[in-house]
Amino acid sequence: MSPRDRFAILPSGEIRINDRSLIDLVREVELPFAQEEYNERITSGEDPSKVDLIAGNYSYLPPKMVMFPSKHLLDEPYRIAEEGFILKPEDSRRGKTTILGCTCGILECWFLLARISLTETTVTWSDFQQFHRDWWTYNLGSFIFARQDYELQLRGTF
């Protein structure tokens, strides 16, 4: 497949896809699931002041984790899901890369995964998944980036 999407990463670590914040893109697809969960918790009697609407409740990974010389967003990801949790061999979360972390600062607390696939000319992000909510469906499709431009962004030479 040929590249069709634009990838940008700011010095802060903020990821933008096609000029939109990754967190905003994710929030849009998570909102119906998070709203349903919120409503169920309130209906079951939980105090509304203590229940958060968790859609898009992420922070970007630290720049040192995603920018070169790190290859986390390429072919040497930190396997947070596999190293921090016991997963069965057939678990769909295996082989995925953590692309967003928790706002509390502990990546393993609440994180989003994606499959990152490389060819000589492209980088594809697909199969998005919230580690702790595997029933949430992410209809983000696949993002296909030109590898050369993608790597320039990771090097901070854009």
What is each of the regions a protein language model found here?
Residues 1-158:
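Intrinsically disordered, low-complexity acidic regions enriched in Pro/Ser/Thr
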